[in-house]
Amino acid sequence: MIRRMEEHDLVRVSALIQNTLLVSNSSDYDLEIVGNLITAFSPSQLRAIAKKRRIFICEENGAVLGTIGLEDNRVYNFFVAPDRQGSGVGRELLEFVENRARKEGWEKLSVASSLTAVAFYRKMGYVRKGEQDNETYGRTVTMERRL
């Protein structure tokens, strides 16, 4: 089930993101970058982020399997539990926000993808538009898809 993240979800969502960064993203980013990202997604930071963008979670039997954020026509904060990657959770979350964006009148959706997720976005129909280097958070790849 996909629903909007609520206050009582903050600790579980933060833990999911932190675990995903350590398990899945650490092969593409050095430990300093991963540490910076972990700090950026603490429960208190997530609370602040949720004030400016909608954050959704995919939940099953009380377990948070994934999370995704949407602000205007941009995807943010998209993470799937490492043991659920490749199971369709990511596809379900991304299609959920694509449908929302489409209903809101957006013609395209964009994302600053981690290096780890580029192949997933490509498979979902996203096209590479450029790259950015951030000293604190590492390299990302801008990708977009027409809706």
What are these regions (language model features)?
Residues 1-15:
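A short beta-loop-alpha structural element at the N-terminal edge
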Residues 18-44:
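Conserved GNAT-fold acetyl-CoA-binding loop/helix
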Residues 53-66:
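Conserved beta-hairpin
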Residues 68-73:
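A conserved beta-strand-loop-helix scaffold within acyl/acetyltransferase catalytic domains
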Residues 78-85:
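A short, internal acetyl-CoA/4′-phosphopantetheine-binding micro-motif in the GNAT/acyltransferase core
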Residues 101-114:
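Conserved GNAT acetyl-CoA-binding A-motif
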